[in-house]
Amino acid sequence: MSITKDQIIEAVSAMSVMDVVELISAMEEKFGVSAAAAVAVAAGPVEAAEEKTEFDVILKAAGANKVAVIKAVRGATGLGLKEAKDLVESAPAALKEGVSKDDAEALKKSLEEAGAEVEVK
């Protein structure tokens, strides 16, 4: 006759704490496992993914209207004409890093209106 799961639970619940510790130790030896490892594996994926709060705005390409894109880059970054032109011509390049989502989306919109291809990461 086989012992049921309920019978095992009843037997364990009637045991003292020391008896349960000895039972666990004996089971670890018998089956070659560790109860601590099982707990660590089960507790591993508890961390929730944090929502990203800082974004990078990347200029992928200047597009057909390079002059308008250079003006938009100057206005957004405060760079001089030569620096903005060099940045636009070296696309793909990071325009701004670590900005808020709203600022990144606003910058992306203004650059796309000027004709640039922009990515927010």
Swiss-Prot record:
One of its GO terms (biological process) is translation. Keywords: Ribonucleoprotein, Ribosomal protein. InterPro entries: Ribosomal_bL12, Ribosomal_bL12_C, Ribosomal_bL12_C/ClpS-like, Ribosomal_bL12_oligo, Ribosomal_bL12_oligo_N_sf. This is Large ribosomal subunit protein bL12. The lineage of its organism: Bacteria, Pseudomonadati, Pseudomonadota, Gammaproteobacteria, Enterobacterales. The keyword rRNA-binding does not apply. It comes from the Bacteria. NCBIfam families: L12. Forms part of the ribosomal stalk which helps the ribosome interact with GTP-bound translation factors. Is thus essential for accurate translation. Belongs to the bacterial ribosomal protein bL12 family.
